[in-house]
């Protein structure tokens, strides 16, 4: 036996692959092992009956299942998350709160604003670039809210002071935010039309977030990126509303 053969790292992955379903975590497990230098024996479970029989044999509830070296109980690592832990890699907590969704929105908005400015003026930003950044951010956030308006309204009603008095406002808010954003992008007189809308929803929103977080000390999730997300209600949420207030005031100041 050569030294290379003796030190060869092998793994066996059982994963569900049928005409109706291909397990994404199985693909990720195979990819992870190959990137770690393993020769992977990729075994497909081609039917529900075959999958159920495999799970019964090994007394497991899910697939994929990863075995390192040989197919024994001692060599079984578990599923994709267990394999990541085995190699010392992090496993995301689906219930953990994170600002990532809203920061991604701000990042994409900045890239769009910079690209538009570069195409029109040869500069990356400038005053108009900042205007476009805020407007694009508002439009993207409104889009995320509108993709599931019911879920958004459920979260929004937890803290917005006006929506708790006038429930229909929770359904109007995303449309108002989107309209203000589009008008700001149009600029000129349309920016002035957008100003009172942005001022109103931004002021109500800023007070609502400030009251819930800093006065009432409530630990809530923010509806800024739509319902069903784990963005914490806090400073980043407040910044969305403060930006709308600033844009509303700026649009009025430009027209004077």
Where are the regions that the model predicts?
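Residue-level "edge-of-site" marker
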Residues: 46, 68, 169
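Residue-level preference for nonpolar/small residues embedded in alpha-helices
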Residues: 25, 46-47, 148, 214
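Membrane-interfacial helix-loop segments of redox and metal-homeostasis proteins
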Residues: 101-256
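Thioredoxin-like thiol-disulfide oxidoreductase module
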Residues: 43-62, 83-93
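Structural alpha/beta surface segment adjacent to cysteine/selenocysteine redox centers
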Residues: 36-39, 52-62, 71-78
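Local sequence-structure signature of Cys/Sec-based thiol-disulfide redox active-site neighborhoods
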Residues: 2-44
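Non-catalytic, surface beta->alpha helical segment in thiol-disulfide oxidoreductase systems
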Residues: 69-96
């Amino acid at each position: 036996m050569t030294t290379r053969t003796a030190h060869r790292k092998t793994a066996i992955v059982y994963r569900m692959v049928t005409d109706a379903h291909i397990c994404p975590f199985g693909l990720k497990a195979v990819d992870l092992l190959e990137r770690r230098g393993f020769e992977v024996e990729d075994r497909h479970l081609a039917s529900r009956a075959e999958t159920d029989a495999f799970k019964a044999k090994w007394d497991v509830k899910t697939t994929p299942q990863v075995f390192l070296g040989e197919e024994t109980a001692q060599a079984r690592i578990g599923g994709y998350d267990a394999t990541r832990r085995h190699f010392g890699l992090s496993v995301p907590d689906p219930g953990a709160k994170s600002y990532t969704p809203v920061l991604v929105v701000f990042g994409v908005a900045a890239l769009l604003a910079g690209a538009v400015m570069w195409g029109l003026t040869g500069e990356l930003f400038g005053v108009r670039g900042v205007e476009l950044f805020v407007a694009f951010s508002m439009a993207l956030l409104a889009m995320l809210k509108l993709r599931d308006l019911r879920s958004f309204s459920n979260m929004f009603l937890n803290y917005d002071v006006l929506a708790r008095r006038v429930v229909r406002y929770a359904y109007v808010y995303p449309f108002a935010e989107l309209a203000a954003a589009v008008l700001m992008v149009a600029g000129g007189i349309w920016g002035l039309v957008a100003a009172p809308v942005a001022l109103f929803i931004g002021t109500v929103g800023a007070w609502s977030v400030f009251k819930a977080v800093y006065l009432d000390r409530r630990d809530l999730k923010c509806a800024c990126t739509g319902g069903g997300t784990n963005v914490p209600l806090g400073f980043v949420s407040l910044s969305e509303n403060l930006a709308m207030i600033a844009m509303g005031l700026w649009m009025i100041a430009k027209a004077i």
